[in-house]
């Protein structure tokens, strides 16, 4: 039998202000939180990158701030949906080589796609001051007892996206979160 708290969680990440990561209530399941009467596992946040540290080729620690607060983020690029296995990359490369040998009319498109895939493969390059959208899970750093985000998607955005994001959050909070009858 499935735990009712798991079956009732949001299917999509809950879009939140950073301050609400710390306001969310824990549940019996350490991976599930509840806020505004809504149980959830994943969150989506947006803000300005204020610190980047402990960076390797595939992992990094970040600090993201919005108008409401700051949160620490751990990001492992191999855990995202954009990762491609070495076997898949080898197969793509071999197919590309074959297509170029035989004069495939779509070779320029394939070349562009290969470049884009290669540039995205397990690459961690973030700069302080850039705007970012982050999707991940809340977890508690056991050494400090502080809530953090374990991110599986980090995308650099823009100031224009930040404005749209803040408007969208205002709408969600006014229409769905704050006035949620299950609160």
Model-identified regions with their sequence ranges:
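OB-fold and OB-like single-stranded nucleic-acid-recognition modules
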Residues: 1-183
């Amino acid at each position: 039998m499935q735990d009712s708290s798991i079956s009732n969680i949001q299917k999509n990440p809950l879009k939140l202000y950073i301050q609400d990561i710390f306001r969310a209530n824990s549940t019996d399941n350490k991976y599930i939180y509840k806020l505004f009467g809504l149980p959830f596992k994943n969150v989506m946040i947006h803000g300005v990158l204020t610190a980047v540290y402990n960076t390797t080729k595939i992992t990094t620690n970040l600090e993201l701030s919005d108008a409401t607060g700051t949160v620490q983020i751990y990001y492992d690029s191999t855990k995202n949906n954009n990762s491609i296995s070495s076997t898949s990359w080898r197969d793509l490369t071999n197919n590309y080589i074959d297509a170029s040998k035989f004069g495939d009319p779509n070779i320029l498109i394939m070349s562009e796609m290969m470049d884009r895939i290669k540039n995205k493969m397990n690459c961690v390059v973030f700069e302080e001051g850039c705007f970012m959208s982050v999707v991940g899970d809340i977890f508690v750093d056991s050494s400090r007892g502080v809530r953090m985000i374990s991110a599986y998607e980090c995308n650099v955005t823009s100031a224009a996206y930040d404005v749209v994001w803040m408007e969208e959050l205002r709408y969600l909070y006014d229409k769905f979160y704050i006035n949620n009858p299950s609160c």
